[in-house]
A protein has these predicted regions:
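Internal acidic/polar
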Residues: 6-7, 96-124
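A short, charge-rich alpha-helical start-of-domain segment used by transcription regulators
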Residues: 14-38
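Sigma70-family region 2
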Residues: 18-19, 42-45, 55-73, 92-94
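Short amphipathic alpha helix immediately N-terminal
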Residues: 29, 133-152, 183
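Amphipathic, Lys/Arg- and hydrophobic-enriched alpha-helical face
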Residues: 29-47, 64, 131, 183
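Structural recognition of an alpha-helix C-terminal capping motif at a helix-to-coil junction
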Residues: 38, 52-59, 72-84
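Arg/Lys-rich amphipathic alpha helix in sigma70-family domain 2
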Residues: 66-69, 80-100, 120, 183
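DNA-recognition helix of helix-turn-helix
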Residues: 87, 138, 147, 157-184
Length: 190
């Protein structure tokens, strides 16, 4: 939670950005770079791709500041704009993947290892790295559902897929991540 002082500083920068002051844009960019980069990394296949998404996101933020209503949380508004920019980027540069490989993976049984214990032993960076290994569409559905709180209906509308396809991607992503986490845990305990 941000302090009143912090909120006042951000509100001042937003007002200055609306007046076209590039110095304020630079301050806003520097201040929110890390948290917005983290948002983009959830949807990107690499840090370079996340950087591209982030740049497009900030461009949309600065272009649409007149649409931000000062009554709400600026960071929540910015996060939504950056998330949508990342999704637009993903659609624009969508990568194809082999459906048969994903179907085989979804049907692979998972060994009897304590999954929750395995997750608890992992760092956030390790979890992000595993999520980034998911195919683009699967990663996008997973992030929207788990991190952004979208429903399958909202995901379907956003990505132009059916709700059942969204659910399939989420289930397959969970199974794949679970398998990889258990595999990593086995390697860590050896």
């Amino acid at each position: 939670m941000m302090s009143e002082r912090e909120n006042a500083k951000i509100a001042r920068w937003v007002d200055e950005c609306r007046q076209g002051r590039t110095r304020a844009q630079h301050k806003l960019f520097r201040h929110f770079y890390a948290p917005m980069f983290s948002v983009c990394m959830r949807y990107a296949g690499s840090p370079e791709e996340a950087e591209d998404m982030l740049n497009e996101g900030f461009l949309k933020v600065f272009s649409n500041l007149d649409k931000y209503e000062d009554t709400g949380s600026f960071i929540a508004w910015m996060r939504k704009v950056v998330t949508n920019a990342a999704l637009d980027y993903r659609r624009k540069y969508a990568m194809k993947f082999e459906t048969t490989e994903l179907e085989q993976l979804a049907n692979t049984p998972i060994a009897g290892v304590d999954y929750n214990q395995a997750v608890a032993q992992m760092s956030a960076d390790e979890l992000v790295a595993l999520i980034q290994q998911l195919p683009p569409m699967m990663r996008t559905v997973f992030n929207l559902f788990i991190f952004e709180g979208y429903s399958h209906a909202e995901i379907a509308a956003q990505l132009d897929i059916t709700e059942s396809t969204s659910a399939w991607h989420l289930n397959t992503a969970r199974n794949r991540l679970k398998k990889e986490i258990i595999k990593m845990n086995g390697e860590l305990t050896k």
